[in-house]
Amino acid sequence: MRRRKAPVREVLGDPIYGNKVVTKFVNKMMYDGKKSVAEKIIYATFDRIEEKTKEKGIEVFEKALERVRPMVEVRSRRVGGATYQVPVEVRATRQQSLSIRWLLEAARKRNERTMVDRLANELIDAANDRGSAFKKKEDVHKMAEANKAFAHYRW
């Protein structure tokens, strides 16, 4: 383990919207350092969303991220030989990174032809409380609800 907490590096806003969350999404989506490819996919996705829903792509994106954000999650805690799943609240930074990760995983698992289509459809679904990423959040919340009895083991 490291001695000190790692400093949080500040990300710059993306070139078109100046939005830091879009930059984080691009960084998470990028393979092999190909940021320009990831950016092209994101912006094409926003255009595709605008074609399909007649809403601004960035607004649907933010709405989807908000809907997929987990409020609570379970963490394993060993107490006297037994391992309990203890529900804990999720910090805002972790909420954001989990929602980004879940949306990308869900989009990659979809079976549309291009990543633009997959991501656009997953974002639209998430914004409308559907899709794999939203289901993942619901499952995490159900686990926390089911293990509410162990909430007093928080640390």
Curated annotation (Swiss-Prot):
Keywords assigned by UniProt, alphabetized: Ribonucleoprotein, Ribosomal protein, RNA-binding, rRNA-binding, tRNA-binding
CDD domains recorded: uS7_Bacteria (cd14869)
GO biological processes: translation
Gene Ontology CC annotations of this record: small ribosomal subunit
InterPro entries given in the database record: Ribosomal_uS7, Ribosomal_uS7_bac/org-type, Ribosomal_uS7_CS, Ribosomal_uS7_dom, Ribosomal_uS7_dom_sf
Molecular-function GO term, any one: structural constituent of ribosome
Highest rank taxon of the organism: Bacteria
Family (UniProt): Belongs to the universal ribosomal protein uS7 family.
Physiological role: One of the primary rRNA binding proteins, it binds directly to 16S rRNA where it nucleates assembly of the head domain of the 30S subunit. Is located at the subunit interface close to the decoding center, probably blocks exit of the E-site tRNA.
Subunit note: Part of the 30S ribosomal subunit. Contacts proteins S9 and S11.
Full protein name: Small ribosomal subunit protein uS7
Source organism per UniProt: Wolinella succinogenes (strain ATCC 29543 / DSM 1740 / CCUG 13145 / JCM 31913 / LMG 7466 / NCTC 11488 / FDC 602W)
Organism phylogeny: Bacteria, Pseudomonadati, Campylobacterota, Epsilonproteobacteria, Campylobacterales
